[in-house]
Amino acid sequence: MSVYLDHAATTPLRECALEAWTRAQRDLAATPGNPAALHFGGRRARRMLDDAREQVACALGADIHEVIFTSGATESDALGVMAAARGMRGRDGARDLIVVSGLEHDAVSHQREVASREGFDWEVLPVDAGGVSVLPGVSGDDAPGSWDGRLALGSMTLVSSEIGTIQPVANFAALVHASGGLVHSDAAQAIPTLDVSFLELGLDLMSVGGHKVGAPAGTGVLVARRGIPMTTDRPGGGHERSIRSGTPDVAGACALAAALTEVVSERAAF
């Protein structure tokens, strides 16, 4: 019998997620409907999606209106970093700087190429010998003057996907906000083991991937604070606050909600 230990890469599908997905698919097969439609089937699908959104918000310490369903953490990272940076520069043309940690997942670090093409500067924070990001300023208490008036967005992973070190995200968020920027964090690796609260971390955006918590691959969430400027490069039908257009995967959202709810309940036993 084999024993699976590579949970940092992906996790087995939880039974609760499989049951939620199957139940939702059967309901949708019996009463088809696009959540954006006004007929009975559409309204029912919308209720299913909203119920899933509420469960996810509760699990992540967020407001229901802040939850945007995506295809996974990679898409959430791309949207969270670039859509917010574009939005900030659109509001204030001088904000052309993006600052990230040196431990970001490729989904964030590879946005550098996109950012460069669009005229953004990209700064990477150093990492100490213990695998923890080094914050700028005197003992990490002060944001550098070079950030003032220029910083559009800062991104720092909550837990490194490579070495598992916990990063000083809350302190980083305070520095970024002091410079007038927005803060994003990829929390995909942290959700199974840490108490993660979007509100308490002081974030503006947070990415979560379904397959890291026992939900199906191809499911994910971007938590985005209401009122922040975001300019997506993927216009469409206006779904998910017009940030992530496309007919939502209702069954996938239900499965993700079930998995996250179970993960949170299990953390209390650690």
Q: Language model features by range: what are they?
A:
Residues 1-270:
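Pyridoxal 5′-phosphate
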